[in-house]
């Protein structure tokens, strides 16, 4: 599956948001790249909407075509479209691995899933976009438990808050999905209504 593999710090600076999490290069220069990066420019309504959509895309590591499909699915849901879109993005397996603290970034989580380190309800899953459901159980596969990424994860457990809609239990770091997240449980600096307005034009 296609994914963006370019310089993510540059995207962070362009969108004025740390897309990685703990990006020291962004923290040093949290303004757009280029000669006029520090200059204040008047941003149009369309530009603000586009930037918010791009923030969401790059935060979750989703290409435009797939993001559009997620939006169209969210439109068909009975709740608020923007909130439903965020719920869909949060339910991706790579995001769940990141939220559970088993990977430092979503990029790393995506790589771990792609390399076949996880099973869901006892079934091997290596698709980062796989969508989890309430009551799903995610396990690190036995052959992967002693690999470096998961040794580090065990040592750093608790460094980042784990959202209440999931739980990590035991030394094998099993992930339990208690529910799919509500908007108040999704901590991302996004104004989802701007994304809805962008696609509604």
Swiss-Prot record:
A GO cellular component annotated for this chain's UniProt record is:
small ribosomal subunit
What role is this protein assigned? One of the primary rRNA binding proteins, it binds directly to 16S rRNA where it nucleates assembly of the body of the 30S subunit.
In the record, which residues are listed under signal peptide? none
Q: What is this protein called?
A: Small ribosomal subunit protein uS4
- Organism, per UniProt? Mycobacterium leprae (strain TN)
Task: Domain (S4 RNA-binding): give its ranges.
Answer: 91-157
Which NCBIfam families does the UniProt record give?
A: PRK05327.1, rpsD_bact
- What keyword terms does UniProt attach to this protein? Ribonucleoprotein, Ribosomal protein, RNA-binding, rRNA-binding
Q: Which CDD domains match?
A: S4
Q: What is the lineage of its organism?
A: Bacteria, Bacillati, Actinomycetota, Actinomycetes, Mycobacteriales
The highest taxon in the source lineage is Bacteria
The family annotation for this protein states:
Belongs to the universal ribosomal protein uS4 family.
Q: Which gene encodes it?
A: rpsD
Task: Check the record and name the PROSITE patterns matching this protein.
Answer: RIBOSOMAL_S4, S4
Q: Which SUPFAM superfamilies match?
A: Alpha-L RNA-binding motif
Q: What biological process terms from GO does the record include?
A: ribosomal small subunit biogenesis; translation
Q: Name one GO molecular function term.
A: structural constituent of ribosome
The subunit structure is:
Part of the 30S ribosomal subunit. Contacts protein S5. The interaction surface between S4 and S5 is involved in control of translational fidelity.
């Amino acid at each position: 599956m296609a994914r963006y593999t370019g310089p993510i710090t540059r995207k962070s600076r362009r969108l004025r948001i740390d897309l990685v999490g703990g990006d020291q290069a962004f923290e040093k220069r949290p303004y757009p790249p280029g000669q006029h990066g520090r200059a204040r420019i008047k941003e149009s309504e369309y530009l603000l909407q586009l930037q918010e959509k791009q923030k969401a895309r790059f935060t979750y590591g989703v290409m435009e075509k797939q993001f559009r499909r997620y939006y169209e699915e969210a439109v068909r849901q009975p709740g608020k479209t923007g909130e439903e879109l965020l719920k869909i993005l949060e339910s991706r397996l790579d995001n769940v691995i990141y939220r559970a603290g088993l990977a430092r970034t979503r990029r790393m989580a995506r790589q771990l899933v792609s390399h076949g380190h996880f099973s869901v309800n006892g079934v091997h899953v290596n698709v980062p976009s796989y969508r989890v459901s309430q009551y799903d159980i995610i396990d690190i596969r036995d052959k992967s438990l002693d690999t470096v990424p998961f040794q580090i994860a065990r040592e750093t457990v608790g460094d980042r808050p784990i959202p209440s809609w999931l739980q990590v239990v035991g030394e094998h770091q099993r992930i339990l999905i208690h529910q799919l997240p509500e908007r108040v449980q999704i901590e991302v600096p996004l104004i989802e209504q701007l994304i809805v307005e962008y696609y509604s034009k």
